[in-house]
Regions:
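A helix-boundary/hinge signal
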Residues: 1-570
C-alpha cells in the first residue's frame, strides 16, 4: 500500500480501485494465478470488525484521512517551513481552515485541501469564555458530527457563545437558550460544562479523548460521513462476529469462523445458490444438502466426531438448534478454565472442513477417529506454542500487570487531611457525590453527600464529585489535603499522564480550586478502599435535599469505616 504517497497526494479513483482489486484477489485467492471467487465486495469487507466486516482499509477514505494529518500539522506548528511556505503561496491573509484553492494551484495543495475538509468536520470548540466562538457558525456542540446549534427565528443574526452565558460565566443563561435555540439542541447545550475561570476557547479533535487528530479516528469519520450509501455488512449476527475476534485461538481459525458465519464457505448449498453447481448433496452421507450446519454438526460423520470429543454442551449435537446457537455455545467454551475445552471445539470445526475438502477434491476418505485425533493434536500444539511464547515474553520483558492499589486505606501524612470521594450516576437523574474526611490519625472529622448536575459519562460524574468535595473542604478551611478516588482514568488526567479533551472544562475547574489550597494532592486507591465514599454516593437523598453534611458517622458507612481503621492500624 503506497502510504507515503497517500500522505501527500490524493490518489485517483481508478488507482484506488486497482489497488483494492489487487488486495481482494490476494485475500480471496490461493496464491496462484487462477481466478477466485470474491464472496463479498471490498466495500463490505472494509467495514469495521464490530460492524461485521473484516476491517480492511477503504483506500479513498484512508487517503483523505492521511492527508488530513498535513492540515493538523499546519495547525499545530504554524511556524514550520511547510506551513510558512504554503501560507505565503495560498493563504497569506487567513488561516488554512478558511483557505481557498486559488488559481494555478499545485496538485499537492489540491490534495491537502481535501484532507482539510475532513478535518473541518471533526474539529470542535471547547467553550471557555466563549468570546471567540460564533454560536451559529462554529462547531461547538459535542455531537456526531460536531455542529453549531439550530437557532430560532427570534435569535439575533450574530451571537457569540459568551452572550449565552450568565453574568458570572459559571452557567448558561437558560432564558436566552430557550428563546434563541431550538428545543432539541437546548438540552445538548445545557449539558456542556462551562467554567467561570476559563480565559480562552479551545479547539480540538472531537473523535479522540486527547483532542489530538489521529488517522484512525479520521478514517472512521470519513467512513461514516460519506455522501454515498454505506455498504451492507456481510450476512451473519454482528454481535456473534464480535465474539470471534475475542477468541484466544489462531488467527486462521478466527477468519474461518467469520467465513462460516458469513456464508463464505464453498459448501454445496452455497455453490448451487451462486449457480456454480446444480448438485448440492452432501458427499459423505448422500442424504441431505450440504449446508453449513449440516456439514459441521448434523451430518452423521460430524455427529460422530462431536460425540467422540465429549463436549459437555448439548447444543452442539442438538439437531434442532440453529447454527448461531451452536457457534455461540462453542465460543463460550473458549473462556473455560480447561485447556481441552478452550481449544478443541474450534479445531474440530477446522479439521471437519479439511477432511471434507480431502474427500471432495482428492477422493480420500478420512475416518472420524482420525479427524478427531488431528484436531486434538492441533489444539495441543497451538496451546503449547502459546505457553512457550508467554513464558519467553514474561522472562525477557515482563508485562506490567494491572495497577494495584494499597491493600487497605492509608492515613495521610502528618498535618494533612485526606478526603475520599466518589460519584454515582444514572441516565435520567442528576449525579450524586459522596465524600469522607479523615485526619492524619485516621479519625473521622466529617462526611458529605450532594446532588450535582446531570452528567453524560461516568468520568464526568467522578470529576463533579471531586469538585463538590473540593468546594466543601475549602469552605471548612483545610489547608493541606489529599483527594483520593478510585477512578484510574481520572487519576491519569489529574496527574498529567493523559490529556482528555472531552472533560477539559471540568479539569479547568478542578485546577482552579486546587490553587486555593496551600497543599493539594490527587491520589488513586482501589475500589475496596473507597467503600465509605461509594456507599454515601449511592445513598438516596431525601426529597428536596441537595446537600447534607454529617458531623457524626452516618450509619451506612459505620462498618466500612471501622474496617478501614482496623486495617490501617495493622
Amino acid at each position: 500500500m503506497p502510504v507515503y504517497s497517500m500522505n501527500v497526494f490524493k490518489l485517483t479513483k481508478e488507482i484506488c480501485e486497482e489497488i483494492n482489486g489487487i488486495l481482494a484477489k490476494f485475500w480471496w485467492g490461493s496464491g496462484n494465478e487462477q481466478k477466485c471467487m470474491h464472496w463479498f465486495s471490498w466495500d463490505r469487507l472494509s467495514l469495521p470488525k464490530r460492524e461485521g466486516g473484516l476491517g480492511f482499509k477503504e483506500l479513498e477514505s484512508f487517503n483523505v484521512a492521511l492527508l488530513g494529518k498535513q492540515t493538523w500539522r499546519i495547525l499545530e506548528r504554524p511556524h514550520c517551513l511547510m506551513a510558512r511556505m504554503l501560507k505565503g503561496r495560498y493563504f497569506p491573509d487567513t488561516n488554512i481552515m478558511h483557505a481557498t484553492q486559488g488559481q494555478k494551484a499545485s496538485f499537492i495543495w489540491k490534495s491537502i485541501l481535501q484532507g482539510r475538509d475532513l478535518v473541518k468536520k471533526g474539529l470542535r470548540y471547547c467553550v471557555g469564555n466563549g468570546t471567540q466562538v460564533n454560536a451559529w457558525f462554529d462547531h461547538w456542540l459535542p455531537v456526531h458530527p460536531p455542529r453549531p446549534p439550530q437557532k430560532t427565528n427570534e435569535a439575533p443574526t450574530t451571537v457569540m457563545v459568551s452572550e449565552l452565558l450568565n453574568s458570572t460565566h459559571s452557567d448558561w443563561d437558560h432564558t436566552k437558550l430557550d428563546a434563541w435555540i431550538v428545543q432539541e439542541d437546548v438540552e445538548i447545550v445545557k449539558n456542556i460544562k462551562v467554567c467561570a475561570s476559563a480565559d480562552e476557547d479551545l479547539v480540538g479533535w472531537h473523535y479522540t479523548k486527547s483532542g489530538i487528530y489521529t488517522v484512525r479516528s479520521a478514517y472512521w469519520l470519513a467512513q461514516h460521513t460519506s455522501d454515498m450509501n454505506p455498504p451492507r455488512p456481510p450476512p451473519g449476527n454482528p454481535e456473534l462476529k464480535q465474539m470471534i475476534w475475542k477468541l484466544k485461538t489462531a488467527p486462521k481459525i478466527q477468519h474461518f469462523c467469520w467465513r462460516m458465519l458469513s456464508g463464505a464457505l464453498t459448501t454445496g448449498d452455497t455453490l448451487r445458490y451462486r449457480h456454480i453447481t446444480s448438485d448440492a448433496l452432501c458427499k459423505r452421507c448422500c442424504q441431505e444438502d450440504e449446508t453449513t450446519i449440516h456439514l459441521f454438526f448434523n451430518c452423521d460423520y460430524a455427529r460422530a466426531v462431536w460425540r467422540g470429543a465429549g463436549i459437555p454442551n448439548p447444543l452442539v449435537i442438538d439437531s434442532t438448534a440453529t447454527l448461531e446457537a451452536k457457534l455461540r455455545a462453542i465460543f463460550s467454551l473458549n473462556s473455560s478454565p480447561t485447556i481441552y475445552l478452550r481449544q478443541l471445539p474450534l479445531w474440530i470445526l477446522w479439521r471437519i472442513w479439511k477432511s471434507r475438502n480431502t474427500l471432495n477434491y482428492q477422493r480420500k476418505h478420512i475416518s472420524w477417529q482420525t479427524t478427531l485425533r488431528l484436531a486434538k493434536q492441533d489444539a495441543t500444539e497451538w496451546q503449547d506454542t502459546v505457553d512457550i511464547l508467554q513464558t519467553t515474553t514474561n522472562n525477557n520483558s515482563p508485562r506490567p500487570g494491572s495497577r494495584q492499589g494499597t491493600r487497605s486505606w492509608r492515613k495521610p501524612l502528618q498535618g494533612w487531611i485526606k478526603c475520599n470521594y466518589d460519584g454515582s450516576s444514572s441516565r435520567d437523574n442528576p449525579s450524586k457525590a459522596g465524600w469522607v474526611i479523615r485526619d492524619d490519625t485516621g479519625q473521622f472529622i466529617g462526611a458529605g453527600q450532594a446532588e450535582g448536575r446531570l452528567t453524560t459519562t461516568s468520568l464526568e460524574c467522578e470529576i463533579q464529585a471531586l469538585v463538590i468535595s473540593m468546594q466543601h473542604c475549602w469552605s471548612r478551611g483545610y489547608k493541606n489535603i489529599c483527594f483520593e478516588g478510585d477512578n484510574q482514568e481520572l487519576d491519569s488526567i489529574l496527574n498529567g499522564r493523559s490529556p482528555h479533551f472531552g472533560v477539559f472544562n471540568w479539569l479547568r475547574e478542578v485546577l482552579a480550586w486546587k490553587k486555593r489550597f496551600q497543599g493539594c494532592k490527587f491520589l488513586w486507591t482501589g475500589r475496596k478502599n473507597n467503600t465509605p465514599a461509594d456507599n454515601l454516593a449511592k445513598q438516596r437523598l431525601s426529597q428536596g435535599t441537595s446537600f447534607i453534611f454529617h458531623h457524626y458517622i452516618p450509619f451506612v458507612i459505620r462498618n466500612s469505616l471501622l474496617l478501614d481503621c482496623t486495617l490501617s492500624s495493622n
